[in-house]
Amino acid sequence: MNSKYLFVFLILNVIFIDLCQGFLFNVIPHAINATASLIKKGTRRRELGSQYDYLQDFRKRELDLDDLLSKFPDY
């Protein structure tokens, strides 16, 4: 009778250890990766803000070039 309970106890321990191992080696790294991607998104937003000024200057130069080319006569 005692061996039956011991066997059930061992099976339950194996199942519990497997669940814990799945949690430690699956959920925790995904949480770390999610945190890292959130940090990267924050820096990306700042980079896009600095690129906006560059793109605005580029559009202004493009409009100036179009204005300059429109003054040339057509051949």
Swiss-Prot record:
Residues 42-75 form a propeptide. It is found in: Secreted. GO terms for biological process: regulation of defense response to virus. The modification Lysine amide is found at K41. Residues 1-22 form the signal peptide. GO terms for cellular component: extracellular region. Belongs to the non-disulfide-bridged peptide (NDBP) superfamily. Short antimicrobial peptide (group 4) family. This is Peptide Ctri9610. It comes from Chaerilus tricostatus (Scorpion).
